[in-house]
Amino acid sequence: MLKIVLKALLIGKKSLTLQFKAFDMKKTILIAMSSAVLLFSSCAQEYNRVYKSQDYTYKYEYAKECFANGKYSRAVGLLTELVTIEKGTENAQESLYMLAMSEYCLQDYESAAQYFKKYYERYPKGYYAEQAKYYVGESLYASTPEPRLDQSPTIQAISAYQDFIDVYPDSKLKDQATRRMFELQDKLVIKEYYNAKLYYDLGTYFGNCTSGGNNYQACIVTAQNALSDYPYSNMREQFSILVMKSKYQLAKMSVISKQMERYEDAQDECYGFLNEYPDSKERVTAEKYIEGCKKFIEKHQKDPMYVPQI
């Protein structure tokens, strides 16, 4: 009986100890949370005091501290005012650069591009001029859309990088800027491919051909322009496939007076494709088209209805 009582007392003691430990843990957490709230409140009060201050030197130093510690939102709030108030002073140049970089770090790339551009325009010989010129391109690069969308921002980014390379041909950032340009050009190539492929897929549909012509002709023009504009693209074969297929389909749907000429053109295109891409996955298609063109030409080459009149 005594053993049972002692065991019960021991269990109770352990339970009480655990309860005290749990209480101490909760107390520690509450103290930590309270301290964090007080610290945040204190920091917020300090920021508000600085923000309302007319001591612009103090405000500038506080903004630099915020920037250095990664508190970019607070830095922006102070620097936006300082770049106007301190215009023409020693601190104005660094304030504008920190503002631009803060916006960049906050992923407000449109504002960042504007401020970096403004910095370079105001201080073309400034301490951060090279970085600012480069980050105009970086800001535009970061905001470029995926290839299916309008690529105007992509063209602007390419132009910005090219401007940077022209102004700083010996910069350590030149190679990175060049890589960015090639990457963005690839995006333009993909956009052109989507456009050409869309025309091909629309095929004989005329609802979108309000200015005459047809979708196969539009596909051919778009793809050939891309081949001319981007001669080193790794998508040359894809564009060539679209040209070949479109020329064959165009010949099939043409009026009698144009069919012979277009079948001959399609046949030449297929031969050219096989010469350039002998191992293409579309080799069988090209050979099939050549056979179709030959049959048509042999059948109608003496028929005056199909032979163009000179």
Sequence positions of predicted segments:
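Acidic, polar-rich low-complexity tracts and alpha-helical solenoid repeat scaffolds
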Residues: 6, 11-12, 17, 22, ...
